[in-house]
Amino acid sequence: MNRTRSDSLAAGGLNWDSLPLRLFAGGNAKFWDPADIDFSRDRADWESLSTMERDWATRLCAEFIAGEEAVTQDIQPFMAAMRAEGRLGDEMYLTQFAFEEAKHTQVFRMWLDAVGITEDLQGYLDDLPAYRQMFYEELPASLDALATDPSPQAQVRASVTYNHVIEGMMALTGYYAWHRICVDRHILPGMQELVRRIGDDERRHMAWGTFTCRRHVAADDANWTVFEDRMNELIPLALQNTDDAFALYDEIPFGLTIEEFQQYAADKGMRRFGTISSARGRPLAEIDVDYTPLHLEDSFADEDRKALAASA
């Protein structure tokens, strides 16, 4: 595609108050280096766990690192879709988004190395059919589709798949599991810091996905149906992944229950409908500077902090 102009040279410059560029600035301000996280105490804590506890936590970590790797590889077409739409601010933010996903892959691998897990972990995913369908089929298919069809409808489907269901349900539920394991027992301080850092990054990722869907729903109400249909298609798959993981164990370690995690995941998924619905009929100019998507993710984080503090 030939370049005909540079948006950064346009009269008035860039709108730094637009949500994508606010997210971009936030990522710059909160930059962190995986090499700065101290994993030195985690090895002893890890070895103090029972064999079943280590197996459960290894599977959880395998799900995370494979997911981070998948998004690092699959997110590129969304950048191209933003370029095709002429949205430089979104394209700038997505370059940061992709970098952060690569960094998340790095830091989970560093943690595995630090606690001495160096064997092939692929088998931990072979037992999770819903996970494999989500990450091996639904995610690449929905994002790859943007390479040939960058339409609003395709963008909404891709955003629902990754930002709302994978990040907004599955990953949030996984972070909650790590908090329950680590905070309740006062163990694995390196993992606690890792999850805190990644969670902060991914709140911005989810906010961008919510913003993107709200933008398209405000522009064309037919996109609300696209959002609803894709959410209703994938939410059962996300909940099935929790069932699959818990079903592998006769006794669930760490005092966790499947009911707690199913309720947690379902709550995070269902509350996203209202935030998208609130954009219907709104002027696009308002949506661009409406920080509701970020406030939603911050409220989820605040609720988790309070719940975990109460259980500690």
Swiss-Prot record:
The keyword Heme does not apply. Fe cation binds at E101, E167, E202, H205. Mn(2+) binds at E68, E101, H104. Binds 1 Fe cation per subunit. It is an enzyme of class 1 (oxidoreductase). Its EC number is 1.-.-.-. Pfam families: Ribonuc_red_sm. One of its GO terms (biological process) is deoxyribonucleotide biosynthetic process. GO terms for molecular function: metal ion binding; oxidoreductase activity. Keywords: Iron, Manganese, Metal-binding, Oxidoreductase. Its cofactor is Fe cation; Mn(2+). Homodimer. Belongs to the ribonucleoside diphosphate reductase small chain family. R2-like ligand binding oxidase subfamily. Probable oxidase that might be involved in lipid metabolism. This is R2-like ligand binding oxidase. It comes from Mycolicibacterium gilvum (strain PYR-GCK) (Mycobacterium gilvum (strain PYR-GCK)). The lineage of its organism: Bacteria, Bacillati, Actinomycetota, Actinomycetes, Mycobacteriales.
